[in-house]
Amino acid sequence: MKKSQKRISNVSEIKAQLKTVETKVHNGVFLFSGIMTIAELAQKINVSVNQIITYFFHQAKMYNLNHSLSEDEIAEICLEFGLDFKKEVQIDASNFMEEVSILDQDKDLSPRPPIITVMGHVDHGKTTLLDYIRKTNIAKNEKGGITQHTGAYQVVFQGHIINFIDTPGHEAFTQMRARGAKVTDIIVLVVAADDGVMPQTKEAINHAAAANVPIIVFVNKMDKPNKDVDRIKNELSALNIVTEEWGGSNIFVYGSALTGQGIDTLFSSILLLAEILELKANKNRYPIGTVIEAKLHHNKGTIATLMVQNGTLMVRDFIVAGYQYGRIRSLENTNGQPIKFAPPGTPVIVTGLNYVPEAGDKFFGFHEEKFAKQLALERKQSEKISKTKVQTKQQTKEKTLNIIIKADVAGIAQALHSTIEKLASKQVHIHILHSGVGIVNKADILLAQTSNSIIYAFNLQIPAAIKAQAKQAQVEIREHTIIYKIVDEIKKQVRGMREIRYELQQIGTAKIIAKFWFSKVGSIAGCSVLSGKFVENCKIELWRNSKLIHSGKIESLQRDKNPVKEVQVGNEFGTHIYKFNDIEIGDELKAFLDVEIEE
């Protein structure tokens, strides 16, 4: 990028889209931004609180004026009173990174390098593949084939740049997704030709599916004499990863990370898929991207690896990441060489931040310190409010029970998978993100944390370290040794999650034939049952001269001064209406009972 080239400011883009939604009726349309109380809604749409409460009473919902209505309930009331409605998203410091749309014109866009994450089962050759690609000896010095560090680097193939995020197993990938980061464009899934699909292979596929990231399969160890390619294809097709040779959509590359066989084909396949994905960005704007890793150095302070996904990052730029801001002091490429700027699709090592951002934090770059500082301050102040909004929003969505199954043998895992899926109801969907064999591990905890899942462990010993990690991540692990107990537990959960629907059915009518006053209680109505029956604590409507006067419930039911459970037609009883004393002889009472509607 030329030094004289002026970058488009992110400040103007964000300021233009920050908006406060004014809750009001405009041209017959009720505009609102989220939940509100009955009292607030009544005032805004100019109807009485009683009208709204009565509406929900007939829906078998006993609300008061301070009850907070969900967005769906607000929509119901609007329809009931003849109003159109529109929910508008309020954009402020707390959510601008998620809600602001950075719209670049087509003429300003140019292709950017793809960002790749390599995943696979331990010892299937992931580290060896990365090592061969970057031509270092890291793999030789690492224990157990498990990567001991994180970061990102670039390779050049036939004049094209390809970015690789080097992560320890699946954890970093999942942590980033947990924080809402969409940084990976393509996953390269490494599967050993002599070993086939293993538990971590399935985990990687589930992670990719949950993040909606396409997969290229690299069948490794093709130099081994006991390779079985057909087995690999069959096992992967059972997991919806189907080779193009069989009419599927997944590219399969065959090779050896040890000898380098197939690496060029892998690069070509990555570039082909990247072209299909049309990965483009605008280099002539201030930067937007994701934090890959960050750590505190005893001499240099915070050192962070950032992936620039749009725009160009330069020294002295101010960035907001997470809930703080800082200024870039230096830029280095992943080889440790100083650079002047980092265009889209570039991993870059930066210094100058006075805090340590978290992996997966999105960042925005600015030229104005005042604006960056203000945004960071407001984001920090609204963090708790923002979390509350997210929780409330999730409560209004379709209810889903997310489950991860781990068992000691494959047959049990499959049986549990099949049985549990059948326990879903019309209101509650059961989503089994992963089922596998073996102990619960860190990847399971992270997947559960990301997807708000419960882990069911059958006939397994859970290591203390895993239990501690689960507790810290607020992930539930439920241990069982009897299948039917898991089934019973999930049935109860589904029932508890579903919105129980009731139908308010009229069960009787009565006439007030006498009234009395007791100072400790209030008005007592002497009634005669004209039809049906009255039962203890039933809901009632009080009618006078064909007008509805009150909706509520009876607080007591007595015959001959003795409490009774119910009173049948033709009999008399005394009752007090809860928090209501304005009764008259001749008033009619209608009794109602909530009846649960079966799905």
Curated annotation (Swiss-Prot):
Subcellular location: Cytoplasm
Domain spans labelled tr-type G: 111-278
Residue span of region G5: 256-258
Signal peptide residues on this chain, from the entry's feature table: none
UniProt region (G4), positions on chain: 220-223
Residue ranges, annotated region (G2): 145-149
Top-level taxonomic group: Bacteria
CDD domains the record matches: IF2_eIF5B, IF2_mtIF2_II, mtIF2_IVc
UniProt binding sites for GTP: 120-127, 166-170, 220-223
UniProt xrefs under InterPro entries: EF-G-like_DII (IPR053905), IF2_II (IPR044145), IF2_N (IPR006847), P-loop_NTPase (IPR027417), Small_GTP-bd (IPR005225), T_Tr_GTP-bd_dom (IPR000795), TF_IF2_bacterial-like (IPR000178), TIF_IF2 (IPR015760)
GO molecular function: GTP binding; GTPase activity; translation initiation factor activity
Pfam family, one: IF2_N
Keywords: Cytoplasm, GTP-binding, Initiation factor, Nucleotide-binding, Protein biosynthesis
Ranges for region G3: 166-169
UniProt KW Transmembrane helix keyword: no
Gene3D superfamilies: P-loop containing nucleotide triphosphate hydrolases, Translation factors, Translation initiation factor IF- 2, domain 3
Any one Gene Ontology cellular component term annotated for this protein: cytosol
Record region (G1): 120-127
Function statement: One of the essential components for the initiation of protein synthesis. Protects formylmethionyl-tRNA from spontaneous hydrolysis and promotes its binding to the 30S ribosomal subunits. Also involved in the hydrolysis of GTP during the formation of the 70S ribosomal complex.
NCBIfam families: IF-2 (TIGR00487), small_GTP (TIGR00231)
Family: Belongs to the TRAFAC class translation factor GTPase superfamily. Classic translation factor GTPase family. IF-2 subfamily.
PANTHER family for the chain: TR-TYPE G DOMAIN-CONTAINING PROTEIN, TRANSLATION INITIATION FACTOR IF-2-RELATED
Name of protein: Translation initiation factor IF-2
Gene: infB
